């Protein structure tokens, strides 16, 4: 029996969506998928409904490499409300404690310094991490607290922007798995007044340029202009996409002659000139350096296929 035909276009690449406030990451993912009429789509790390900013959305074959963006560094701009702590550590939650603001500028700098570098962070109960098969926020909504292991995070840069009254603004460049809400909650406790997030914007993921972000409104306008005709859609929308290999562009490249690449596509490990001694590599084919997927250097120094792109007829 033949496989059922997938609905939608074979469109491949990464869209840098400027996520609006007040909607979930999955909601905007589905909207982008419909606008592009794409057969496959996936985002690369959810943003809270309150948050805005860069949400890379992988389409088609690019979804195979979304994990590499989940593992990448992020940069955020955050504004905290001082003097109030909420159950979710952001403005979407309920205020559970109010305290006076009584710290000095010196106290603030000392507190900020303690978050720079590599530290251990206990995730919020209001997160999508799982405990015994259920997401933490499902327990939290039932008023339950379950054990969470501290996880290692790295804050590469924590820049003070401003402190005015009960508002504190920071810019944070951090490693994967860092919860900005938790940093703000922990900072509020160190300062003795409590704090929660009232504004959060993701400025950057990996090395993707901020100026390449597009809004849902811009996408919808282009799609309407194209009158949903497939050829017009590709001309109007596909030019907005980053290449499908962009999530793995920082990995070492191994370029294979077409004949050798053919064996790799059949699942065989192959010898390659100038390959690194170990680790994951980005594999390209021929003089055009066409991206064909990711491989790993095996114990014999050969390139073994790990995640390859399916080739579609043009």
UniProtKB/Swiss-Prot annotation:
It catalyses: uridine(55) in tRNA = pseudouridine(55) in tRNA. Keywords: Isomerase, tRNA processing. InterPro entries: PsdUridine_synth_cat_dom_sf (IPR020103), PsdUridine_synth_N (IPR002501), PUA-like_sf (IPR015947), PUA_sf (IPR036974), tRNA_psdUridine_synth_TruB (IPR014780), tRNA_sdUridine_synth_fam1_C (IPR015240), TruB_C (IPR032819). The active site is at 48 (nucleophile). It comes from the Bacteria. One of its GO terms (molecular function) is tRNA pseudouridine(55) synthase activity. The keyword tRNA processing applies. Substrate binds at residues 43, 76, 179, 200. GO terms for biological process: mRNA pseudouridine synthesis; tRNA pseudouridine synthesis. Its EC number is 5.4.99.25. The keyword Isomerase applies. Responsible for synthesis of pseudouridine from uracil-55 in the psi GC loop of transfer RNAs. PANTHER family: PSEUDOURIDYLATE SYNTHASE TRUB1, TRNA-PSEUDOURIDINE SYNTHASE. Belongs to the pseudouridine synthase TruB family. Type 1 subfamily. This is tRNA pseudouridine synthase B.
